[in-house]
Amino acid sequence: MRFAIVVTGPAYGTQQASSAFQFAQALIAEGHKLSSVFFYREGVYNANHLTSPASDEFDLVRGWQQLNAQHGVALNICVAAALRRGVVDEMEAGRLGLASSNLQQGFTLSGLGALAEASLTCDRVVQF
């Protein structure tokens, strides 16, 4: 079965993102196809490479990145939500005159069209 996940909670402070990550791992372990993860609203903080958890905590941002690298899962973040919350790639940083970018490698700034496409091409869309 083909799945897409929507994450609306930040990497830390709520359970949404960590539950979504555990669900993603379980899907893959059971042989399902996870096509994409779409990060929306506060979920865009999952793509901030400046996030620095304590040494005894799981690094969820890097966990998502590994999911992308190892399993080819598309990690799309809503560009409008990201810009409002200060998460930018190099192109947007340049366009906005910012000194640097902070989008974690493996994540892509996307529009809601990426979510619509996932909804049309997947058997299930699960929101956290």
UniProtKB/Swiss-Prot annotation:
Transmembrane domains' residue ranges: none
Main location per the UniProt record: cytoplasm
E.C. code: 2.8.1.-
Subcellular location: Cytoplasm
InterPro entries in UniProt: DsrEFH-like, Sulphur_relay_DsrE/F-like, Sulphur_relay_TusD/DsrE
Similarity comment text for this entry: Belongs to the DsrE/TusD family.
Assembly with partners or alone: Heterohexamer, formed by a dimer of trimers. The hexameric TusBCD complex contains 2 copies each of TusB, TusC and TusD. The TusBCD complex interacts with TusE.
NCBIfam families in the cross-refs: PRK00207.1, sulf_tusD_dsrE
Name assigned to this protein: Sulfurtransferase TusD
Source organism: Escherichia coli O157:H7
Phylogenetic lineage: Bacteria, Pseudomonadati, Pseudomonadota, Gammaproteobacteria, Enterobacterales
Gene: tusD
